[in-house]
Amino acid sequence: SRGIGRMIAAGFLKQGARVYICARKAAECDATAAELSALGPCCSLPGDVSTAAGIQSLVERFRAQESQLDILVNNAGAAWGAAFADFPEAGWDKVVDLNMKTPFFLTQALHKDLLAGAATGHAANVINIASIDGVSVNPMETYSYAASKAGLIHLTRRMALRLARDGIIVTAIAPGAFASDMNRDARDHADTVAQRIPLGRVGVDDDMAGAAIYLASRAGDYVVGSTLVVDGGVTHARS
């Protein structure tokens, strides 16, 4: 309901899609859905997808309203930063559970719905939101975040191989600096962050929405298991 998820939701709405958004905080999820409804039909399905029970609840409420799913964007995520000597087990458990396990189990739970979407003549799509920190090394001590996003990129490949036979295309987006609550530097110090980006600016809504629309559209139907890096060139500058 915020940040990158909101950018993608708005982009899909502008293309005529009916969009369901999910977030743990019901009030925020409802408010965002109400705001985005100015662009098209946007429905709020608040819930906690970090648990099996939360995923099942979300799926049941979705199925009460829809008989198929055309596009699933796995965007829920968490980060944790701490010095190497102090990095706690909780910082691994929370981040890996949400960043790697949740995309797998949510896709698994919605497999039947995606199959129904694929049966309409156009492939269904699963888009996992990874990070450039899973592609190249960030100097910040976010050990579990970097490892989980690298794992999600590889999981995207593995899932893509299995689900392609079902007419379900799995891809990923690896965002760079986009203003969000998770990336507060890009949100609060965009000019400073932009100095480290070859393109000279942080990402904007249309950059992220355009990437997701491409992958979910007919133009992206032959892109299977790939990760689209959307970062203004940062990954190459790190290399």
Where is each model-derived feature located?
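Residue(s) in the substrate-gating loop at a strand-loop-helix junction
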Residues: S131
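Alpha-helical segment proximal to the catalytic Tyr-Lys
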Residues: K112, L161-R162, D221
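Short C-terminal tail/terminal secondary-structure segment
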Residues: I213, V224-S239
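Active-site helix of classical SDR
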Residues: T107, S148, T156
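Canonical Rossmann dinucleotide-binding motif of NAD(H)/NADP(H)-dependent dehydrogenases/reductases
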Residues: S1-Y20
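Short, small/polar-rich loop/turn modules that mediate ligand/substrate recognition or access, typified
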Residues: A164, I169, V223-G225
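Substrate-binding pocket helix/loop in short-chain dehydrogenase/reductase
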Residues: A83-F84, P88-V96, V193
